[in-house]
Amino acid sequence: MSRYRGPRIKIIRRLGILPGLTRKIPKKSMKLRSLSLQSKSKKKDSQYRIRLQEKQKLRYHYGLHERQLLKYVRIARKAKGSTGQVLLQLLEMRLDNTIFRLGMAPTIPAARQLVNHGHILVNGRIVNIPSYRCKPQDSITINTRTQTIALIQQNLGTTRKTKLPSHLMLRSTENSATVKQIVSRQSVGLKINELLVVEYYSRQA
């Protein structure tokens, strides 16, 4: 399944607010209609459908292909600790998501573009792989040879009121940041029941 490129408002109307996908919020009338439909179908929802919905939230929020998400689930299953929490850590520590959580980009797709086009350096080297897994003590800076510094500073100004996750440290005046530690469950930027996602993939992973 390819990455979604259709109307994002349709997705958040169905799945709820997904900050990584879009800043848009459904209009009140749309939200009420959606809640009404949800309450009517709540009793009819099968366990499979509930798990599928949680999986879709995760996939659309982080902007992943189905195969990519399944790969992360398989890695999480082999790791020590809670599979669901390890899965969230793997996704949260991706470079594109880290750029988004720092406020350097308004969404994860926008952060992915910054990475793809060579605007981001990790430990002094250009990293153009959005799935790069950030590690504690990684230093993230903006490529001064590009013309995106003004745009990133504008994004930082827009998101200044947003609370920065505890595992990240931002030095906005220096256009740089540091990954202090692995993200905790409390700092994950999405309201999700990861156990349902793991259960969805129980026969595939």
Curated annotation (Swiss-Prot):
PROSITE patterns on file: RIBOSOMAL_S4, S4
GO biological process: ribosomal small subunit biogenesis; translation
Gene from which the chain derives: rps4
Family that this chain belongs to: Belongs to the universal ribosomal protein uS4 family.
Keywords tagged on the record: Chloroplast, Plastid, Ribonucleoprotein, Ribosomal protein, RNA-binding, rRNA-binding
Organism: Chaetosphaeridium globosum
Pfam families reported in the protein's UniProt record: Ribosomal_S4, S4
GO MF terms, alphabetically ordered: rRNA binding; structural constituent of ribosome
Principal cellular location given in the protein's record: plastid
Keyword Cell division: no
Quaternary assembly: Part of the 30S ribosomal subunit. Contacts protein S5. The interaction surface between S4 and S5 is involved in control of translational fidelity.
Purpose: One of the primary rRNA binding proteins, it binds directly to 16S rRNA where it nucleates assembly of the body of the 30S subunit. With S5 and S12 plays an important role in translational accuracy.
SMART domains reported in the protein's UniProt record: Ribosomal_S4, S4
Source organism, top-level taxon: Eukaryota
InterPro entries: Ribosomal_uS4, Ribosomal_uS4_bac-type, Ribosomal_uS4_CS, Ribosomal_uS4_N, S4_RNA-bd, S4_RNA-bd_sf
Protein name stated in the entry: Small ribosomal subunit protein uS4c
Cellular component annotations (GO), alphabetically ordered: chloroplast; small ribosomal subunit
HAMAP family tied to this protein: Ribosomal_uS4_B
Residue intervals of the S4 RNA-binding domain: 93-154
Record's subcellular location: Plastid, Chloroplast
Gene3D superfamilies: Ribosomal Protein S4 Delta 41, Chain A, domain 1 (1.10.1050.10), RNA-binding S4 domain (3.10.290.10)
The keyword Signal is annotated on this UniProt entry: no
NCBIfam families: PRK05327.1, rpsD_bact
